[in-house]
Amino acid sequence: MFDNICKFLAETFPTDFATWLLGEPIALTELSPSELSLEPIRADSLILLQSEDVVLHLEFQTQPKRDIPFRMIDYRLRVYRRFPHRQMRQVVVYLQPTTSDLVQQTTFTLENTCHNFEVIRLWEQPTPDFLQAPGLLPFAVLSETDDRVGTLRQVAQAISQISDPRTQSNVAASTFILAGLILEAEAIQQILRRDVMQESVTYQVIKAEGKAEGKAEGSQEALQQVAMNLLREGMEISVVSRLTGLSIEQVQLLAQAAG
């Protein structure tokens, strides 16, 4: 769920992420992993955004994994093979505090080969960095703050200032999910307006997964129903796919069934 939400935010607010990670508001578009290789590529937590000059590779992780350094060089070489003249920035964002040494790793080394990538540990990042743009608001509560509840109130106030209803509801629902990594649901619900979140497509996914928790087949059916509802609302197949975690092919079949 956390992977899907972070991916949704990055692909919905690419300019906010470009400003944060690249230092300037570059216009970025989604780069499909299928463009990089004929071989299967693990894309569940992979985010690729591109401009004419640069490719931004993002991965959000709740837990450290030993294979991250290898994955970084693997994706770097795939992009080089496809776009040899483009620069590439690779950033791994860890969401939860941990004492594991793995979150300090920024290099893949093999004999005479050395590849570097960037790591951001959210709990070490200044909170104000995430309060200036809608797409970054959901991460503020995970940043370096001594008062997470107070920070969530700041985020809720900023969300209330978003004029577009759909953007407001999606940012609120994304904040609800990510805040759940470090705060109790009751505390979050006291601050974030449930009526705003209920209008969000991401909130629909939360409810579907919650109702089907512990039942794999039920979860799949619930997500398919959410996907059908979103398709009927006219949402694009690619957006439905990344929100629900269903594959493009699965959503295409549902779209055909929906007529």
Feature roles, as predicted:
Residues M1-G259:
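Elongated, amphipathic alpha-helical interaction scaffolds
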